[in-house]
Amino acid sequence: MEFTPLAFESLGVRSQATLVETKDVRILIDPAVSLAPRRFGLPPHQIEVDRLTELAKKIYEEAKIADIIIITHYHYDHHDPGYVIPLDIYQNKTVYIKDPQNFINPSQKFRRAPRFIKTITGKPKTMESADGKVVKYGSTTIQFSKAVPHGADERLGYVIQVAINDKDSTILFTSDIEGAPKNSHIDFIKSVRPNFLIIDGPLSYLLGRALSQDELDTEIKNMEEVVRNGLQYAIIDHHVLRDPNYESVLKPVKEVANSVGCKVISASEYLREPPQLLEAKRRELFQRDNRPAKIPRGLAKLLSAGEGG
């Protein structure tokens, strides 16, 4: 089994788009990209816009030849109703989605999920809610968790975690659990016992606003527990890499991981590419070049639709 991070914060955008390939199927998880509409009081920089365009094209090309597309929830950095990535990626695909009716917050239940489903209806070969299901394709098993909260606060909604096993190894994609603050987050990880983990990390860039110090401490403690669970690799990338101080936030987790032989890295490190922490460095980007960005129409619609994730 091979997996490729396609778009993450360390690659320059808001996303967790991931390609997983086994000898049986090509699986694309959360084919979407976004940017922070405002960060440090500033709009997206042109470099961020250009990078988003580049990675959106990459996701599009990989999506066209995927067999399965999975949508773990309805935030715009995890699903795209056609704003940036063309909807023909869903043509003749098998699509698994987060249940749009149950364990879902109002903004996703009544607006985002219905809009997305309406826009792709008629394109997929099949489309079904995935929460709690297990499906098999040859020697490949895809296991979906029951809906778990998007972090500590259910008001942000719920997500599904995805475990893929090809009999040789298991990769687990946590989606947006914000560093696993709840038992329901880590219980699924423990039950699956993956070799490889892709996890988003805490919302430390919102410490003191949407995250308390006690909550952050709990999330770090739980992530330490997770890396003790027999992992070989943990890619920690997404929410936490929006924080300019992410290295100090993750230092305790990395120390525990090193002690048990687990390698903790970002998506860019996994790909052996230099990090492009563009959102975290937005102030510096504007200090070097403060010209307004040229925002494509689709991206402008996405940014005006709200952050969500």
Curated annotation (Swiss-Prot):
<dbReference type="Pfam" id="PF00753">
    <property type="entry name" value="Lactamase_B"/>
</dbReference>
<comment type="similarity">
    <text>Belongs to the UPF0282 family.</text>
</comment>
<dbReference type="InterPro" id="IPR050114">
    <property type="entry name" value="UPF0173_UPF0282_UlaG_hydrolase"/>
</dbReference>
<dbReference type="InterPro" id="IPR001279">
    <property type="entry name" value="Metallo-B-lactamas"/>
</dbReference>
<dbReference type="InterPro" id="IPR036866">
    <property type="entry name" value="RibonucZ/Hydroxyglut_hydro"/>
</dbReference>
<protein>
    <recommendedName>
        <fullName>UPF0282 protein Saci_0277</fullName>
    </recommendedName>
</protein>
<dbReference type="InterPro" id="IPR014426">
    <property type="entry name" value="UPF0282_hydrls"/>
</dbReference>
